[in-house]
A protein has these predicted regions:
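Extracellular/periplasmic carbohydrate-active domains that bind, remodel
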Residues: 18-471
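Bacterial Sec-dependent N-terminal signal peptides
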Residues: 1-23
């Protein structure tokens, strides 16, 4: 039997609400596709001047729905928006100006918004993208030739064009609060060139398929992410910069718990415009394969005025990675004025994500436990770094039989100037705690690096450092 729910349209004016009248009938049996009915309800509210669309308990099977200015979508407890597993139910954006490297952003999503203002998604309900089933359908349709993906990744045998859970492009005054969000086919929540964005109290469980980032903020201004729980098969909370003429500016990430098969909080790797005035604090990290904090500026952008403090990371592959690189040809990056303080991290001997269904890819060489690298490139140093009140416990147990880079050969560590940035990118390193290279002005204050077992390497190795203070 087809179940239905009556939607009431409410106009929000200040603290008051005005009932506009009867809404539309939307199936919520979880089997009947209701994309058209949901879109009709959203559009009707927009045409009335704005208001709230409340979804009662039930399951709403839908393809892509587009948010409109002035509309709040509220999911009551027990309400689930369930993404269709048919890729034909999703919009595909192919505009060449979507980003400097558009292959990484499809613009396709379950919840889509373009150029809207004053939009909110709230409630105690759930949005489920059914990402695994959707991704496998996309993969099958590519191989049958029905929907070929021109950028199909044959090395990893998976499609690149997969819908995100959210995609908001050039939007203003956006709030997303309290919802449970899960199982995207691609990235999770994507906000591109948006302004005045608030994400709070979210539970993001995005482990359905490869490249399942949790939250991606791309060249946005005035962003607040707070009190969120994120479990992602790729980066947890990731700031990206795809637009050379823009940057992420005035972004705060606060009081979040993150578990990741990649890095917990990451800047990059896309870094065309850069990251400025970013504040990350009070973050708990656990069972994370790569870095607790990764700051990467490698595509010619400018990264400036970064403050990271009060980070508590357990069972995490690396505490900190800061990298200035040059993937963008002649255009050099700038990375300066970075403060990391009150960071604690426990690095295990084995894989932090050993019990995950989707695990991060291993490197293809033998190595001992990696130190935390902070590395610029020749002629382009990272500038003005402060590490203060840092505690990192390493497992030790390094052996020369596994891998050996003696101090007298530290000049043989490859620069990897134009390579993909990752804390493992340099191969075996000659230290166990910190590896510092090509830096102008770095201060280490109250640094406590410890070993659970012996390690034959020195704690810190530095090369090409101008202005080194250690106290």
């Amino acid at each position: 039997m087809r179940k239905n729910v009556l939607i009431v349209l409410i106009l929000l004016i200040g603290a008051a609400t005005t009932v506009l009248g009867k809404g539309v009938t939307i199936p919520n049996d979880g089997k009947t596709l209701c994309t058209a009915e949901l879109q009709q309800a959203i559009d009707a509210i927009y045409k009335k001047g704005g208001g709230r669309l409340t979804l009662k308990a039930g399951t709403y099977l839908t393809g892509c729905i587009q948010m409109r200015s002035g509309v709040e979508l509220y999911l009551e407890e027990g309400a689930t928006i369930l993404g269709s597993t048919n890729p034909r139910d999703y919009l595909i954006r192919t505009s060449s100006n979507i980003a400097d490297n558009p292959d990484e952003i499809t613009g396709s999503a379950l919840i889509y918004a373009q150029g809207v203002e004053n939009v909110a998604l709230r409630g105690k309900g759930r949005i489920d993208g059914q990402g695994l089933a959707l991704a496998l359908t996309i993969d099958s349709l590519h191989h049958t030739g029905e929907m070929p993906d021109p950028n199909y990744n044959y090395r990893r045998m998976r499609p690149s064009k997969r819908p995100s859970l959210f995609y908001f492009h050039k939007c203003k005054d956006i709030e997303v609060e309290q919802l449970k969000l899960q199982s995207s086919a691609g990235w999770g929540l994507v906000f591109d060139l948006c302004e005045n964005l608030r994400l709070s109290g979210l539970r993001v469980h995005n482990r359905a398929y490869w490249n399942n980032d949790g939250i991606d903020i791309t060249d946005c201004r005035h962003v607040r992410i707070s009190d969120c729980w994120v479990d992602a098969a790729d980066d947890g909370i990731c700031l990206k910069s795809h637009h050379a003429e823009s940057c992420n500016y005035d972004v705060e990430v606060a009081r979040c718990d993150i578990r990741s098969s990649a890095s917990a909080v990451k800047f990059g790797t896309a870094s065309w415009g850069g990251f400025r005035n970013i504040y990350v604090h009070d973050i708990k990290v656990e069972d994370t394969f790569r870095s607790a904090i990764a700051i990467e500026c490698v595509d010619g952008g400018i990264t400036d005025s970064i403050l990271v403090e009060r980070i508590d990371a357990k069972n995490t592959g690396n505490a900190l990675f800061i990298r200035l690189g040059q993937r963008a040809g002649e255009r050099a990056s700038v990375l300066k004025n970075v403060t990391i303080r009150q960071l604690k991290c426990e690095v295990p001997f084995g894989r932090p994500d050993i019990n995950y269904d989707l695990r991060g890819p291993e490197v293809d060489y033998f190595h001992n436990i990696h130190p935390a690298p902070i590395c610029g490139i020749p002629g382009h140093p990272i500038e003005n770094v402060l590490l203060e009140d840092i505690e990192i416990q390493y497992p030790g147990r390094a052996t020369k039989g596994m891998a050996y880079m003696p101090l007298w050969r530290k000049g043989d560590v490859p620069e990897q100037i134009d390579k993909y940035p990752e804390f493992t990118m340099f191969g075996e390193l000659p230290s166990w705690g910190l590896y510092l290279r090509h830096i102008r002005n770095i201060t280490l204050k109250n640094i406590k690096l410890s070993l659970a077992d012996d390690d034959f390497r020195p704690m810190i190795v530095d090369e090409d450092i101008e202005g080194f203070k250690f106290f």
